[in-house]
Amino acid sequence: MKIGILALQGDFNKHGLILEQLDLEPALVRYTSDLNHVNGLIIPGGESTTMTKLMDRAGFYESITSFANTNPVLGTCAGLIMMSYQAKDRRIKTLGLLDVDIERNASGRQIHSLCKLLNVNINGKSQPIDATFIRAPKIIRYGPDINVLATFNGSPCAVQSGLHLGLSFHPELNGITIFHEFAFKKLAALIEERVDAA
């Protein structure tokens, strides 16, 4: 199974290492046509206003929205911002894939970044992980279809809806594989079930 990593900016190489640990094939996505050759997509961290300009210039908004209708998408940090319904910054154009509103850089500057122990609930199982927050966005509203997988300081920091998963932290920096596995093995299996049932 080939998983695309949006390679416009951000530290996308570490996501590739996580995918390889799960026996998934990483593929860098730099052009909209690259989406035709992958079965899922990661929108990595970066700077969300810059990402808005790069995605707009390359025509990614329409192509990712269409791709996400039938394929799993995972967004981390700025990737979560891009997947949200709305960010509290008019410079940012979002994809509207997750029914959440976001406040960007809620954890402060990069020097205030931190690593925290979180309890994550996936598939009815709870497990602790170390989560690295870097200028992390904060979810300030979420809709009824959102499944909260983890919270930090009383706010959701890992959410899922349908085939889409958003995280305000960077699991790839701590070698955490459970979210990539959930997005591209568990959620992807739902697609196969739908196809078989059709």
Predicted regions and their residues:
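Conserved beta-strand segments of alpha/beta enzyme cores
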Residues: 25-27, 130, 147, 165
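Redox-cofactor binding/interface segments in oxidoreductases and associated redox assembly factors
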Residues: 43, 75, 167
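N-terminal beta1-alpha1 cap of cysteine-dependent amidohydrolase-like domains
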Residues: 1-57, 63-66, 72, 177-181, ...
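Cysteine-nucleophile active-site neighborhood
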Residues: 48-119
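Pocket-forming structural segment of enzyme catalytic cores
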Residues: 89-155
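C-terminal and late-domain segments of enzyme folds
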Residues: 10, 135-198
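Beta-strand-turn-beta hairpins that frame and shape the catalytic cleft
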Residues: 1-2, 126-129, 159-165
